Amino acid sequence: RSVHPSITYWCSGVTKSKISTFRQVFYDKGLKDDWFLNNFKIAHRSQGWIFSHAGMVNRQIPYGMTVDQVIDEVLPDVWLNFRNITYRQNPLISAVGIARGGEDNVGGLLWLDYYNEFNASPDIGKQVFGHSYVPEPTATALNTEYESWNLDTNLKDYAIIRDGRLTTYKIR
């Protein structure tokens, strides 16, 4: 979508109405709230899985760091500075890859393109994400220690994780 008259990025399902609502909730209201700032996470771990908006890949991880270090140490700082217009946006979350109309080598955690940039990896581990529309929940590296699921089915499906095992269900 257009963020400036001369800049266009592609993000499935984005409409002017959704952008307006997002802006109002997350910027005009939500991000001014200390609780929201202190508790919102760009990536979250639970039951052996990583949850993020668009997914994580090896190329996003700074050299010499582990995924755990990025989630626990780097992302909280990046998030706290996300709205600071004097702070250069960190490509870990804000990079827009060529597949989405950007100029970065790979998209960040908010912009990674599933079809052209994502690959499951034992270095990252199990994960759940969306951002790139798929008609049905789609698994990569199923039944491995780096099983990854894209659940962006336009609100048609959800998943439950029990004992580390992910199962998808249709929303009725």
Regions found by a protein language model. Name each.
Residues 51-53, 126-132, 150-153:
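Active-site neighborhood of phospho(di)ester-bond hydrolases with catalytic His/Asp-centered motifs
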Residues 1-3, 57-59, 117-119, 128-140, ...:
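Active-site environment of divalent metal-dependent phosphoester hydrolases
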Residues 136-172:
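Binuclear metal-dependent phosphoesterase catalytic core
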Residues 76-136:
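Alpha/beta-hydrolase fold catalytic core
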Residues 9, 85, 98, 166-169:
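Hydrophobic transmembrane signal anchors and adjacent membrane-proximal interface regions, especially
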